[in-house]
């Protein structure tokens, strides 16, 4: 027995998706990818569905064709509290990404993220403090401290919001970019993990009856992209309660699994058989021969983030909109796969690259490794870092520029490579940082020369209270002065809504002296050209042809793709005009 009415499940899930995509209506036949969804939003969908009493998985959200199918897969969920004794308070085991930060070196106090949101016209100093206090007391990791015994979280009430909040009067006007930048840097300099100063907030008060702005500056060790979505949602709910004269704490949903508990689950997983079985795979990925040629090796003593070169480019909504919605759906791929296909095509034309390239990818890290874990509302740094090896040989053909068949070959390779990664890459960090034997083997390998991070969609359409202010935006990877670069070239991509639709932004950084601006600009502009070529190719070939690509087809009963030779697959693709 299913135990749940499909129509009711459809109603719930349509409402969840409409809220997350900030659109008036979603119907049962609408598909998650067609709406512009990605794995980060999928985690939010799962969390919102849980709060409404439905159990679905991230895989369901990403692979099922529409809301009707997702509703049919949903199961009723019994509400449960945290496991006994898990109040989130106490020692926190260092997770793989926390070990990675320690190895990287530099001033961890200033490794921060920030986000600037609009504040409502009725906000006062007292109500701002009440809203902020509700966040501090709800989310354990905002109260973390690192002392001589290691990391530990403190009880609710240990940090007073008034001590974290600064008011800046702007006297009837919006804060300028210079004012916001100056205050964010000053807030960054006040952060101290040893002193337990993890959060700083700056309220730009335009005066009575006028909307203002709030800059939240948080040490990166306790926050990531999904955490920010949790925090901004809680800001809005806490304010609604305060404005109505209610206690804000009661307006915030409970957190099912604490970060402290998650750190224990990761340690147990690192010692398990599933993780040990991945060692040959990861040793194969990091084998020699996939480096990026630079003028010299990356030097942590001089290649610091504050000395890096920077380049910011934007892909207009006319291309980014279809690329991340209808085209991704038509290609049978998610946004990350489409973006990395374009990057592979660009890398194949980039002088420093050979026939293979090692790229370090970032994942959201909230993977399904334990049945008890519900991380949809947990604030913390869950990011997984893992290397991926892309084959570039043959992808430099000229036809790719015009959306020719090389684009299909690139997508096939990238999609199959990414889908072959065990457990979305979480095992690499467990082995690299929590396994004393395999960790040494992986540490000895040459690191990836390129880092890629897709942060997904940030904020809604803008303009509303507690929503991202595009004029000031956010920075979700902001190492402070003296932090060594992790890669010779790095790119962070994210999507912001505009009046014309979604715009893809790409922030590039490089170690000056290893590469120069002309080299990086050539790669950055080539990437955007190849993304445009994928739009052209998808329009040219149509959805029926793309859906037959090998990695887009789930195995039928009694038949697996392992039984089909590559020559046969190539013949099939050629018959459909893909090769």
Give the positions of each predicted feature.
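Active-site-proximal acidic secondary-structure segment that organizes catalysis
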Residues: 44, 51, 133, 199-260, ...
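Acyl activation and transfer enzymes in specialized metabolism, enriched
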Residues: 10, 120-143, 216-233, 309-354, ...
